[in-house]
């Protein structure tokens, strides 16, 4: 968020003495951006002696008193400045974001790559760990969830800290402790500001026999292609006409 702070100090002398009392008034104007300018929120804060007493939040749409001190100001500002303050969402926040002063890093969006892997060789009904690797995303804000057969899993879920890559993108690993059963479908669900819709990657549990049958089928197809090619080659050679008789001189 971009923050502007205005501080005003006043130090009136105390009657009958030389000591001074200091009063600090602060104003903070804050702009919050989600996915570029897709969603913008503007917040104005009024603070007196380190205590916020009045606030305007664009999500609320009007000035609200935070303490009793701000009640009269809230009524006055809502009558005199409300429309102008509401317009600052575009005239200040959006304008500054799209202007030349906006850092490139604020506008940068990199979509994550998502891959699921199993920590150990699959064995049904045995304890195992699924790892959802989410890499190369920016900005850092991201939400990764696990689902089993459409239901969110919250038990047995753990995550690494965000890891910063050399190009300023990030990566994170989110693990799920589980004991897979045949037919179960596990889904890694990823939400990120760079995405219009979440990324979902599925992993399906299958028995060793099913895996062996699948590998055998793939191997059979490969061998079939090899033998087919060999048969076509032999047929091609056999279709060539017989060679003519050798010259008479050679027969003698």
UniProtKB/Swiss-Prot annotation:
Organism whose genome encodes this protein: Mus musculus
GO-annotated cellular components: early endosome; external side of plasma membrane; Golgi apparatus; membrane; MHC class II protein complex; multivesicular body; plasma membrane
Superkingdom: Eukaryota
Database matches in PROSITE patterns: IG_LIKE, IG_MHC
SMART domains according to UniProt: IGc1, MHC_II_beta
Topology, Extracellular side: 17-213
Annotated TM spans: 214-234
Keywords linked to the UniProt accession: Adaptive immunity, Disulfide bond, Glycoprotein, Immunity, Membrane, MHC II, Signal, Transmembrane, Transmembrane helix, Ubl conjugation
Region forming the signal peptide: 1-16
Gene Ontology molecular function terms on file: peptide antigen binding
Annotated region described as Beta-1, given as residue ranges: 17-109
Coiled coil: none
Positions of disulphide bridges: 31-93, 132-188
Family the UniProt entry places it in: Belongs to the MHC class II family.
Record topology, Cytoplasmic segments: 235-252
Gene Ontology BP terms: adaptive immune response; antigen processing and presentation; antigen processing and presentation of exogenous peptide antigen via MHC class II; antigen processing and presentation of peptide antigen; immune response
Region of interest (Connecting peptide), ranges: 204-213
Keyword Disulfide bond: yes
The protein's name in its UniProt record: H-2 class II histocompatibility antigen, A-F beta chain
Pfam families registered for this protein in UniProt: C1-set, MHC_II_beta
Region annotation (Beta-2) ranges: 110-203
The Ig-like C1-type domain, residue ranges: 112-200
Entry comment on modification after translation: Ubiquitinated in immature dendritic cells leading to down-regulation of MHC class II.
């Amino acid at each position: 968020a971009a923050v502007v702070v205005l501080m005003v100090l006043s130090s009136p002398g105390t009657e009958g003495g030389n000591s001074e009392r200091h009063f600090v008034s602060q104003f903070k104007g804050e702009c919050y951006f989600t996915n570029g300018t897709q969603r913008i929120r503007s917040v104005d804060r009024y603070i007196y002696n380190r205590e916020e007493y009045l606030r305007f939040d664009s999500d609320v749409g009007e000035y609200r008193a935070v303490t009793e001190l701000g009640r009269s100001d809230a009524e006055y500002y809502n009558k005199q400045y409300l429309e102008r303050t509401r317009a600052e969402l575009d005239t200040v926040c959006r304008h500054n974001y799209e202007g030349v002063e906006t850092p490139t890093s604020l506008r940068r969006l990199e979509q994550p790559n998502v891959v699921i892997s199993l920590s150990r060789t699959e064995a049904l009904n045995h304890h195992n760990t699924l790892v959802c690797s989410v890499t190369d995303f920016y900005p850092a804000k991201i939400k990764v969830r696990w689902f089993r057969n459409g239901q969110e899993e919250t038990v047995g879920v753990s995550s690494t800290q965000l890891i910063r890559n050399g190009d300023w993108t990030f990566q994170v690993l989110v693990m799920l402790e589980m004991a897979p059963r045949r037919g179960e479908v596990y889904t890694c669900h990823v939400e990120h500001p760079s995405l219009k819709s979440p990324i979902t990657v599925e992993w399906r549990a299958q028995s060793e026999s099913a895996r062996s049958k699948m590998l055998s089928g793939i191997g059979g197809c490969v061998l079939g292609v090899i033998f087919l090619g060999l048969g076509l080659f032999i047929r091609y050679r056999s279709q060539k006409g017989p060679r003519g008789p050798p010259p008479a001189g050679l027969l003698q």
